Amino acid sequence: MKKKKLFLGTIISCVVLALSACGSSDNVVTSKVGNITEKELSKELRQKYGESTLYQMVLSKALLDKYKVSDEEAKKQVEEAKDKMGDNFKSTLEQVGLKNEDELKEKMKPEIAFEKAIKATVTEKDVKDNYKPEMKVSHILVKDEKTAKEVKEKVNNGEDFAALAKQYSEDTGSKEQGGEITGFAPGQTVKEFEEAAYKLDAGQVSEPVKTTYGYHIIKVTDKKELKPFDEVKDSIRKDIEQQRLQDTTGKWKQQVVNELLKDADIKVNDKEFKNTFEFLEKK
């Protein structure tokens, strides 16, 4: 899904660039109610899409200047796009004014470079900070401390944790599974929760832990032995890379953009677009 979105974003840019290249008085449309010239169309596109297109063009140059993308890498992405779009692939190329797959490869290179840039944000420290044992974790989330203490007391008295989660937990995503958090891993929960969870051994239950969501009673149901760092460091790095590529907050994408464009020493000579990169001055 992600790569399909990238592909569609690329071809939309192609449409804008192709149409805004027009500038003559030739008619694009004739009708009884009036004609539309290429110059009029070009002006309209420039006003509506010029700033965003200029931004994308400069960003693409900055990306490809720092992160090189080979023809083979681009070809692989094109093949994946063909598989996803099926019979619509060829007609889509024609619609956006691309003559062949080679032209599309060039248009997709900045997107590939962007992925490389985000992956490059992962440091050795990030990998070491995520070097933690695999665990299965369950929790019961309640709104107030009083309820949290009452539920913890029930756990201490031997009541079933999963049953209590179904009865009390406010977390609709886990309560019906007895509080089990699917795919618990470093960086996927708030700091207070994560720190408390990793301090527990298998079978242990925490005291109430306060976070922005409320109060959690955390139980570690399984905790595997930590493997040697050299055996798992590559896997850890790949996991972090995927988390950042899929990050819905846009944090890592914006970090990459800000750093690249600041280093690019951009000067806009066209008054109409003088504010395109003003956000960099505020950082």
From Swiss-Prot:
Cell location: Cell membrane
Record keyword Lipoprotein present: yes
N-palmitoyl cysteine-type lipidated residues: 22
A single Gene Ontology CC term: plasma membrane
EC code: 5.2.1.8
PANTHER family on file: FOLDASE PROTEIN PRSA, PEPTIDYLPROLYL ISOMERASE
Membrane topology: Lipid-anchor
GO MF entry, a single one: peptidyl-prolyl cis-trans isomerase activity
Domain spans labelled PpiC: 132-222
Signal sequence bounds: 1-21
Task performed by this protein: Plays a major role in protein secretion by helping the post-translocational extracellular folding of several secreted proteins. Important for the secretion of the protective antigen. The three PsrA proteins in this organism show different but overlapping substrate specificities.
Highest taxon in the source lineage: Bacteria
Lipidation (S-diacylglycerol cysteine): 22
Main location, first listed in the record: membrane
GO biological process: protein folding
InterPro entries xrefs: Foldase_PrsA (IPR023059), PPIase_dom_sf (IPR046357), PPIase_PpiC (IPR000297), PrsA_foldase (IPR050245), Trigger_fact/SurA_dom_sf (IPR027304)
Enzyme class, broadest EC rank: isomerase
Protein name (Swiss-Prot/TrEMBL): Foldase protein PrsA 3
Keyword Membrane: yes
Record-stated family: Belongs to the PrsA family.
SUPFAM superfamilies: FKBP-like, Triger factor/SurA peptide-binding domain-like
Keywords on record: Cell membrane, Isomerase, Lipoprotein, Membrane, Palmitate, Rotamase, Signal
Catalytic function, reaction form: [protein]-peptidylproline (omega=180) = [protein]-peptidylproline (omega=0)
